[in-house]
Amino acid sequence: MSETIVSEQTVSEFSPASADASQSVKASVGKINLLDLNRQQMRDLFMSMGEKPFRADQVMKWMYHYCCDDFNQMTDINKVFRTKLQEIAEIRAPEVVDEQRSSDGTIKWAILVGGQRVETVYIPEEERATLCVSSQVGCALECKFCSTAQQGFNRNLRVSEIIGQVWRAAKIIGAFKVTGQRPITNVVMMGMGEPLLNLTNVVPAMEIMLDDFGFGLSKRRVTLSTSGVVPALDKLGDMIDVALAISLHAPTDDIRNEIMPINKKYNIEMFLSAVRRYLEKSNANQGRVTVEYVMLDHINDGTEHAHQLAECLKDTPCKINLIPWNPFPGAPYGRSSNSRVDRFSKVLMEYGFTTIVRKTRGDDIDAACGQLAGEVVDRTKRTLKKKMAGEPIAVKAV
């Protein structure tokens, strides 16, 4: 076979271009990070090199089933092609720079992305192991009860930085083909950031999670959580089918406007209408959505709020997760008492809603829901504005 010349144009074509991600960890000069490509993109790349499309299947299997990042170890691929790959490509996941282990088995990793840190959380249980993955460096939505939101926002994560969190966790825990057991059975896009504000990178990353030559997860085991970016939610339904969870957290617009400013743009009825449209397109959700509801003491946790929530959700097939609020420094809220949570739950069940009180995991290492912070260079200048206004600033506990 004649030698294939790979031009700078080829490299550029298959290197995801994103202004938001331009400050990411620098790749080797001119090399394509294969973690940025889904299977079709990898096939297109390899065909441009004069190779057969099935080569992408082979390489992906090594990458994701064995967590292999060394082309020389891919022994069922001929040496000539391996040499080509070494010249133009690499497999480079973001590095873990800190690890904390909770007394309950939860692990939190700080992942370095372009000089900043995002956080990824591994939650093992008897029957499954869930990985909570970040989609952005910080978050722009300013939800008042969430630590991530208080850090401000810097940029979207690239595909390689999203799927790289899964790859890095799987490599640490033990790759499927190495141990014989799946290190990760579920992935939830519930880490730092709003996934629907980064569809360009989140969707290809989820495609790799679902791909049989990727991590091979069922679409019911990959969950995207959103605070309600309605146009993007409508778009998501045409792009991919995964389980959906919605961060509702309030039964009325008045309360939600106060704790989740996005509601001023997309109110509850607009949000739930978009959810119902998504459910009509989706098989992964089995006809119902998961509603997430953080319990804030004397803010949204009274029995009157439970009745309002039941009325609000009467036309939306769902199950409800009640989430004990997890504190962080500078936050103005308190956690609801067990008795208030119990009364709230009983009201919802009387209406016929499947209602679960989520067990808090990893709170002793600030890895629980709403506690992820990382290290963010805030492009929104949110923390500076708070400081100038004399408002409390949430800081990551050390």
UniProtKB/Swiss-Prot annotation:
Pfam families xrefs: Radical_SAM (PF04055), RlmN_N (PF21016)
What is the UniProt remark on how the cofactor binds and its stoichiometry? Binds 1 [4Fe-4S] cluster. The cluster is coordinated with 3 cysteines and an exchangeable S-adenosyl-L-methionine.
Entries under InterPro entries matching the protein:
Aldolase_TIM (IPR013785), Methyltransferase_A (IPR040072), RlmN_N (IPR048641), RNA_MTrfase_RlmN (IPR027492), rRNA_lsu_MTrfase_RlmN/Cfr (IPR004383), rSAM (IPR007197)
Q: Which top-level enzyme class is recorded in the Swiss-Prot or TrEMBL entry?
A: transferase
Q: Where does [4Fe-4S] cluster bind?
A: C139, C143, C146
Q: Where is this chain's protein located in or outside the cell?
A: Cytoplasm
Record bears the keyword Iron-sulfur: yes
The active site lies at: E119, C369
Q: Which residues bind S-adenosyl-L-methionine?
A: G193, E194, S225, S247, L248, H249, N326
- Principal cellular location given in the protein's record: cytoplasm
One Gene Ontology molecular-function label: tRNA (adenine(37)-C2)-methyltransferase activity
Q: List the disulfide bonds.
A: C132-C369
Q: What is the E.C. number?
A: 2.1.1.192
Q: Which reaction does it catalyse?
A: adenosine(2503) in 23S rRNA + 2 reduced [2Fe-2S]-[ferredoxin] + 2 S-adenosyl-L-methionine = 2-methyladenosine(2503) in 23S rRNA + 5'-deoxyadenosine + L-methionine + 2 oxidized [2Fe-2S]-[ferredoxin] + S-adenosyl-L-homocysteine; adenosine(37) in tRNA + 2 reduced [2Fe-2S]-[ferredoxin] + 2 S-adenosyl-L-methionine = 2-methyladenosine(37) in tRNA + 5'-deoxyadenosine + L-methionine + 2 oxidized [2Fe-2S]-[ferredoxin] + S-adenosyl-L-homocysteine
Q: Where is the Radical SAM core domain?
A: 125-364
Required cofactor names: [4Fe-4S] cluster
Q: Which GO terms describe its cellular component?
A: cytoplasm
Q: Which CDD domains match?
A: Radical_SAM (cd01335)
* Keywords of the record: 4Fe-4S, Cytoplasm, Disulfide bond, Iron, Iron-sulfur, Metal-binding, Methyltransferase, rRNA processing, S-adenosyl-L-methionine, Transferase, tRNA processing
- UniProt GO BP: rRNA base methylation; tRNA methylation
What family classification does the UniProt entry report for this protein? Belongs to the radical SAM superfamily. RlmN family.
Question: Misc remark for this entry?
Answer: Reaction proceeds by a ping-pong mechanism involving intermediate methylation of a conserved cysteine residue.
Write down the PANTHER family for this protein, in alphabetical order: 23S RRNA METHYLTRANSFERASE, RADICAL SAM CORE DOMAIN-CONTAINING PROTEIN
Q: What does the UniProt record say this protein does?
A: Specifically methylates position 2 of adenine 2503 in 23S rRNA and position 2 of adenine 37 in tRNAs. m2A2503 modification seems to play a crucial role in the proofreading step occurring at the peptidyl transferase center and thus would serve to optimize ribosomal fidelity.
Which named protein is this?
Answer: Dual-specificity RNA methyltransferase RlmN
